[in-house]
């Protein structure tokens, strides 16, 4: 048990927050959440279609249960409108305009885009 805690702490300290969460060691272990069921303040994985670009670093994702703002900054949006994607990241806890802070985007062709810069 102490080794697990040490490893998780080290992963977190090195900026691998997604890897620091038990149960999220790889993409296959991450449960898919419907956009309408996303809870604030949690790590989530959602899938949908890019509905529209909101800014150079933000887009709206849509599934059959709703829409969600996805923030990729300070990176450029690496997807296109109409593209089916899966996004893993942190859902902030803002009451007004909550956003999913993307850490990883998987495109329909299987390409994984890891967003290496953290958010400010």
Question: Language-model segments: which ranges?
Answer:
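Bacterial N-terminal signal peptides that target proteins for export
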Residues: 1-9
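OB-fold and OB-like single-stranded nucleic-acid-recognition modules
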Residues: 4, 15-120
């Amino acid at each position: 048990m102490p080794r697990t805690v040490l490893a998780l702490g080290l992963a977190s300290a090195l900026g691998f927050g997604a890897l620091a969460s038990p149960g999220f060691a790889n993409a296959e272990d991450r449960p898919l959440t419907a956009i309408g069921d996303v809870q604030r303040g949690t790590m989530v994985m959602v899938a949908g279609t890019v509905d529209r670009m909101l800014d150079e670093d933000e887009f709206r994702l849509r599934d059959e249960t709703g829409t969600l703002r996805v923030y990729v900054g300070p990176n450029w949006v690496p997807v296109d409108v109409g593209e089916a994607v899966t996004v893993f990241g942190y859902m902030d806890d803002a009451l007004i305009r909550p956003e999913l802070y993307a850490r990883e985007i998987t495109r329909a062709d299987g390409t994984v885009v890891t967003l290496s810069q953290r958010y400010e």
